[in-house]
Swiss-Prot record:
Keywords: DNA-directed RNA polymerase, Nucleotidyltransferase, Transcription, Transferase. PANTHER family: DNA-DIRECTED RNA POLYMERASE SUBUNIT OMEGA. The gene is rpoZ. Signal peptide: none annotated. The keyword Transferase applies. InterPro entries: DNA-dir_RNA_pol_omega, Pol_omega/Rpo6/RPB6, RPB6/omega-like_sf. It catalyses: RNA(n) + a ribonucleoside 5'-triphosphate = RNA(n+1) + diphosphate. It comes from Rhodococcus opacus (strain B4). GO terms for biological process: DNA-templated transcription. Promotes RNA polymerase assembly. Latches the N- and C-terminal regions of the beta' subunit thereby facilitating its interaction with the beta and alpha subunits. This is DNA-directed RNA polymerase subunit omega.
Length: 101
């Protein structure tokens, strides 16, 4: 008997459908690649949350004809959340970030 623990696989060995869909959102882009762009996980959270707030405010102001905030810098997917858009912008190096701002 092997001492190696069993690992669930998304690709079944017997030709059936996978047990789950490929995860999207916070795992895409990968968290390790996002962390490489900031000094800490806490800085990443604040950075992404501030940008997501700007994107959300942009969508809210569109109906009023005010253009105070910058919209998404990447093509947003259908029904994509502002935080996911912000994380993709960070991953694509489309934003400049200064620690402490």
């Amino acid at each position: 008997m092997s001492s190696t623990p069993a690992v669930a696989s998304a690709t079944p060995s017997h030709g059936a459908l996978p047990a789950y869909d490929t995860p999207l959102g916070i795992t895409n882009p990968p968290i390790d690649e996002l962390l490489a762009r900031t000094s800490s996980k806490y800085a990443l959270v604040i950075y992404a949350a501030k940008r997501a707030r700007q994107i959300n405010d942009y969508y809210n102001q569109l109906g009023d004809g005010i253009l105070e905030y910058v919209g998404p810098l990447v093509e947003p997917g259908l029904q994509e959340k502002p935080l996911s858009i912000a994380l993709r912008e960070i991953h694509s190096d489309l934003l400049e970030h200064t620690e402490g701002e």
